Every structure is written in structure tokens, then in C-alpha cells.
């Protein structure tokens, strides 16, 4: 994953490769927000629909119902902004080798959490700035860095 790879290299002052010149966006989500979404979903399991029609099936209301949710921050962040926050929190800047978009990569992705918000009241609570700060603190402690 990009956060760990970037943290590893930035913490050591090593150059990093930045795809799409850092312009693409991703939905960086703090782990506690993901856990919160999972727990909320577990506390609200899908229920069978007594009017389930086998001729016009809807798997979300069958006798074995399920729901699929996106869990994320619902706030896309440009990769370069994420890298800047890592550098700020590690207290150093590194050389960025800017690369073009790679084959098969997508310019922007983020989670639409509207169904999870509607069904279980999920709302991510950790802004990217706070999440990166906590991630770097954890990273330093875990890997014995100051």
C-alpha cells in the first residue's frame, strides 16, 4: 500500500516514485474509521424479506440476505497532498520522481459511503491531516523511530 511504502522511504530520506505526477486522488481512510464502519455494519445485519420473489430475485432480501457497503473517508485527496502531510509529520522532504500515469491505473477513486451512512449512521470522523499524524506516530513507535 502506498502509505506504508511512502512512510518507509520518507522516514529514511529516500526518494519516492510519484505516479501521475501526484495529481490523482485516492480515498485515504484512517483505520479507526474503517473499524467503526465494520462494527456498525455487523450491528445491523441484513434481514430476509418475507415477500422475496424467486422469479425476480433480489439477493439483498433473499433468505440468505447480504449487503455490500463501501467504507471510506468519502473525501478524495490528491496524492501529492498526502505526500506533503507525510513529509510534514516525518519532519523531512524527499526527492519526488514524478512519473506518468501507469497502464491500468485509474486517475481518481473514492468510496461512496451514502448507503452505509443511510443504513447504519456511519460517518468517517478523522480528517486526513489528523489521520496522517496518527499514522506517522504509530509508524515511528512500531518501528522504533524517533
Please report, for each region that a protein language model flagged, where it lies by residue.
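C-terminal substrate-binding subdomain of Rossmann-fold SDR/epimerase-dehydratase oxidoreductases
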Residues: 8-146
Amino acid at each position: 500500500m502506498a502509505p506504508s511504502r511512502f512512510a518507509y522511504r520518507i522516514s529514511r530520506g529516500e526518494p519516492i516514485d510519484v505516479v501521475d505526477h501526484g495529481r490523482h486522488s485516492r480515498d485515504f481512510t484512517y483505520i479507526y474509521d474503517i473499524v467503526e464502519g465494520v462494527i456498525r455494519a455487523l450491528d445491523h445485519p441484513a434481514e430476509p424479506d418475507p415477500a422475496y420473489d424467486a422469479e425476480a430475485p433480489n439477493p439483498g432480501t433473499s433468505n440468505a440476505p447480504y449487503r455490500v457497503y463501501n467504507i471510506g473517508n468519502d473525501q478524495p485527496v490528491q496524492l501529492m497532498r498526502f505526500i506533503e502531510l507525510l513529509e510534514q509529520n516525518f519532519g523531512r522532504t524527499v526527492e519526488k520522481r514524478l512519473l506518468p500515469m501507469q497502464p491500468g491505473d485509474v486517475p481518481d477513486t473514492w468510496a461512496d459511503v451514502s448507503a452505509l451512512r443511510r443504513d447504519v449512521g456511519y460517518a468517517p470522523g478523522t480528517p486526513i491531516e489528523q489521520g496522517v499524524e496518527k499514522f506517522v506516530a504509530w509508524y515511528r513507535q512500531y518501528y522504533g523511530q524517533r
